[in-house]
A protein has these predicted regions:
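Binuclear metal-ion centers of metallo-dependent hydrolases, dominated by the metallo-beta-lactamase
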Residues: 16-23, 100-122, 203-251
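Active-site metal-binding motif and surrounding structural segment of the metallo-beta-lactamase
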Residues: 41-88, 180-191
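A short, acidic, amphipathic alpha-helical segment used as a generic capping/interface helix at domain edges
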Residues: 174-180, 198-208
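Short active-site oxyanion
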Residues: 15-16, 34, 77-81, 216-218
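Active-site metal-binding loops of divalent metal-dependent hydrolases
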Residues: 39-41, 59-60, 86-87, 133, ...
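Structural motif
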Residues: 36-37, 56, 82, 149-152, ...
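Core dinuclear metal-dependent hydrolase active-site scaffold
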Residues: 4-50, 105-186, 248-251
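Metal-dependent catalytic neighborhoods of phosphoester/phosphodiester hydrolases
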Residues: 66-75, 93-96, 228-235
Length: 251
C-alpha cells in the first residue's frame, strides 16, 4: 500500500496506493482499478486511462458530494458512479440526455443494508455492501480482487454536548449496532471519521471500529484540517500506531 506516508502491503500481497485528497475524499488505486470516495474539493491526481474508475458518494452533504465528479466520465473512458439514493442527480441526468449521453447507464443508486455487484471491465466482480449511517446516507464495504476496503462516510459515534442525553444514548446504540455487523472481519484499508468537534468524545468512533475490525491500515478523516487530532489519537493509543496513518495535510 503506497501513500505519501509510506509503503506497505495489503494482506493478500497486492499493492495499493492511497491518496488523501481532502476531508473525507480519498483515491485508492489497485493493480486493476481506481476507487474515488466522497470527493468535494482538492486536486484529483491524473489517472491511468487504461484503468476503470468507480466513484463513490456516501451521502448528499456538501462536504461529501460535489457534482463536479460527473465531469470525470468526459476525461476517462470507463467511469461508474455509486451514489446514495438521496443524492440529487436528476438535473445531471437531464443535462447529459440533452447532450446524447446516457448517464444512467454509468450509475448505481444504493440504499442502506444492501449488497450490490458491479461487473468490471476485466470481468471481475466488485461487491459493494452498504451500512446504515448514523447521520446521513451509507457507509461502503468493498470486496474486489481479494482486497477489502471500508469507507465510513458519516457513519460514526456522533455524541454532541448540546444534544439531550437520550439522543446521545440512541446514537451510541445505533453506532454499536452497525459495528457489530463488521465484527471479526478483516479489511485491508479503512477510512473512518475522527472529528475534533466532538471534543472528549472525538476518539470513540475510531476506538469502537478498531475494537471490532482487524484493519491493515486506517486513515482517519473528517478532521476539518485539524490534523493534530490524529497524532494525539496515536499518542494516546500506541497499540494502533502501526495501523493508524498520521496524515499531516491535504493532498
Amino acid at each position: 500500500m503506497n501513500s505519501d506516508r509510506g509503503k506497505g502491503l495489503s494482506q493478500n500481497g497486492e499493492i495499493m496506493r492511497v491518496t488523501f485528497i481532502a476531508h473525507s475524499g480519498f483515491l485508492v488505486e489497485t493493480a486493476s482499478a481506481y476507487f474515488l470516495f466522497d470527493y468535494f474539493k482538492g486536486e484529483i491526481p491524473e489517472l491511468d486511462q487504461k484503468k476503470p474508475l468507480v466513484v463513490f458518494v456516501s451521502h448528499s452533504h456538501r462536504d461529501h458530494y460535489n457534482p463536479v465528479v460527473f465531469d470525470l466520465f468526459e476525461t476517462y473512458p470507463w467511469v461508474h458512479y455509486v451514489l446514495d439514493k438521496d443524492c440529487g442527480i436528476k438535473w445531471k441526468l437531464r443535462e447529459c440526455a440533452d447532450q446524447g449521453t446516457d448517464l444512467a447507464a454509468k450509475l448505481t443508486r444504493v440504499r442502506k443494508n444492501q449488497t450490490y455487484e458491479l461487473t468490471m471491465p476485466d470481468g471481475g466482480t466488485l461487491q459493494i455492501t452498504t451500512l446504515r449511517s448514523t447521520d446521513a446516507g451509507v457507509a461502503y464495504l468493498l470486496d474486489y480482487g481479494g482486497l477489502r476496503i471500508y469507507h465510513a462516510g458519516d457513519l460514526s459515534h456522533w455524541i454532541w454536548k448540546d444534544k439531550p442525553e437520550d439522543y446521545n444514548q440512541r446514537m451510541a446504540e445505533r453506532y454499536l449496532r452497525e459495528m457489530e455487523k463488521l465484527k471479526g472481519i478483516t479489511v485491508d484499508v479503512a477510512f473512518v471519521p475522527l472529528d475534533p468537534r466532538l471534543l472528549q468524545d472525538t476518539p470513540v468512533g475510531l476506538e469502537v471500529f478498531l475494537e471490532h475490525v482487524q484493519a491493515g491500515k486506517v486513515f482517519p478523516m473528517h478532521v476539518w484540517e485539524k490534523f493534530s487530532v490524529i497524532q494525539r489519537f496515536v499518542k494516546e493509543h500506541p497499540c494502533y500506531r502501526d495501523i493508524v496513518v498520521c496524515l499531516s495535510g491535504n493532498g
